[in-house]
Amino acid sequence: MSRISRQAYADMFGPTVGDRVRLADTALWVEVEKDFTVYGEEVKFGGGKVIRDGMGQGQMLAAEAMDLVLTNALIIDHWGIVKADIGVKHGRIAAIGKAGNPDVQPGVSVPVGPGTEVIAAEGKIVTAGGIDSHIHFICPQQVEEALTSGVTTFIGGGTGPATGTNATTCTPGPWYLARMLQAADSLPINIGLLGKGNASRPEALREQITAGAVGLKLHEDWGSTPAAIDCCLGVAEEMDIQVAIHTDTLNESGCIEDTLSAIGDRTIHTFHTEGAGGGHAPDIIRAAGQANVLPSSTNPTLPYTVNTVDEHLDMLMVCHHLDPSIAEDVAFAESRIRRETIAAEDILHDMGAFAMTSSDSQAMGRVGEVVLRTWQVAHQMKLRRGPLAPDGSYSDNFRVKRYIAKYTINPALTHGIAHEVGSVEVGKLADLVLWAPAFFAVKPALVLKGGMIATAPMGDINGSIPTPQPVHYRPMFGALGAARHTTRMTFLPQAAMDRGLAEELNLQSLIGVAHGCRRVRKADMVHNTLQPLIEVDAQTYQVRADGELLVCEPARELPLAQRYFLF
């Protein structure tokens, strides 16, 4: 039997079982757990390569073959870190296994035919498109920025740069919901809208859900009172939608105990649960220990650095329409920014107590940095806390699975859309992101939406090949024309579907129905199920989890930073 060295094999077909790959310039390493390909029967496209007629490509018709095959990909997902070929059919993931020609090759589960396109993923990492569950729809240009960072789904609210939207993630009322759904129809990203949840009577909330709100948002700037919380959650239980909350920083209508009492045992998604983005001062972070609370972070506090506190004060004044000449407004801002709780947030993420990350786009958060900052936290916590059990010193597979779940499967589960997006699994939309390992979490090599390339780095258009400088991200065919409609999805609640809303608004995109939100608990958050007893000292702001003091020094230097953004 002919043999080649492990290095030569990795260079040709990508890493295999036992090989390790470093994630960009972080301290994180992954080890390949399983290889679905067959040694000696690997497929590869190119001159003199395998995927040729009668060799790795068979004679089957389009009905039997894949539309697209990603060859020899290193998949990193919550369920595993594996080497496989990925087959895409009709815009969805159809198979994960061994690609090739079943007429002449053994073990083929991803058939390649004359109607099959190929993306060479040898030496590349493939992840699910990210889900940003805290979007202020302030401007449509956020979509391009997010796509080029590896995010393919938005959950949030807004109507443009209105004062209300600059502060709160709400699309209020049926008229605005209709207009925003129509606007979203032409954006090459999956979208679900949140209506305004601040009401003490249910009728105005029900009409927003039947008008297309896939969830409701309670925000302190609209009054997150116990009455509004109770009413909103009551409607959510009735109509199977998720509720997100930004609680009362000033503790005017009650403290965290009152909010938790109003919530009861009902499921709720708490935004920026640390509190710098808003919420009961100084102890909203305690909510992360509740069995029915699905806690997320927004990215400006991730990770804790020497610049975090100073940056936040100015951001907060702008976003929440505060006046620096009014002493009470300044005190409000300062009450939200606490070094101790920000430092504890990173540790709670590493422990699996915080389940999700998100952006808070243009409203104290950066829409293009969800993926990047999540991995900066993972890196920083490895340096501070060492390997995360059951990982040893050889790889960080469990820590990597924990962190990737925070912006993929967990927000999908939280908002009832995990049957459509959130992981690299058969049957789901082929929203896939390819990364060169050296650029992981920073600059994708390709971003696929519904099986079609939506954005990619592209060189000089007049070049003789695609790679001459200047190279920058550009929209691709999957983001243009009617192709957008068949590769993107608008999420609606069942109540809107029963009404025939998609037909009423003449929506052309794929429609996904969000459901099952009310059954999701903290125990369902993949790799992030910890429910510690969290305590905050009201005088010093020190945070303890199950009695352990959570402290760490701010980072002075980070990976995935300046060296990647010189050009």
UniProtKB/Swiss-Prot annotation:
The pathway that the record names for this protein is: Nitrogen metabolism; urea degradation; CO(2) and NH(3) from urea (urease route): step 1/1
Q: Where in the cell is it found?
A: Cytoplasm
Catalytic activity from the UniProt record: urea + 2 H2O + H(+) = hydrogencarbonate + 2 NH4(+)
**Cofactors per UniProt?**
Ni cation
Annotated Urease domain ranges read 129-567
Q: What is written in the cofactor note of this entry?
A: Binds 2 nickel ions per subunit.
As for PTM, the annotation reads: Carboxylation allows a single lysine to coordinate two nickel ions.
* EC numbers, comma separated: 3.5.1.5
Per the Swiss-Prot or TrEMBL record, the active site comprises: H320
List residues modified as N6-carboxylysine. Answer: K217
Keywords recorded for this protein, A-Z: Cytoplasm, Hydrolase, Metal-binding, Nickel
Q: Which InterPro entries match?
A: Amidohydro-rel (IPR006680), Metal-dep_hydrolase_composite (IPR011059), Metal_Hydrolase (IPR032466), Urease_alpha_N_dom (IPR011612), Urease_alpha_subunit (IPR050112), Urease_AS (IPR017950), Urease_asu (IPR005848), Urease_asu_c (IPR017951)
Where along this sequence does the record place binding of Ni(2+) 2? K217, H246, H272
> What GO molecular function terms would the record report?
nickel cation binding; urease activity
Q: Which Pfam families match?
A: Amidohydro_1, Urease_alpha
Cellular-component GO terms for this entry: cytoplasm
Q: Where along the chain is Ni(2+) 1 bound?
A: H134, H136, K217, D360
Which family does the record claim for this protein? Belongs to the metallo-dependent hydrolases superfamily. Urease alpha subunit family.
Q: How does it assemble?
A: Heterotrimer of UreA (gamma), UreB (beta) and UreC (alpha) subunits. Three heterotrimers associate to form the active enzyme.
What name appears for this protein in its UniProt entry? Answer: Urease subunit alpha
* Organism, scientific name: Pseudomonas entomophila (strain L48)
Gene that this polypeptide is encoded by: ureC
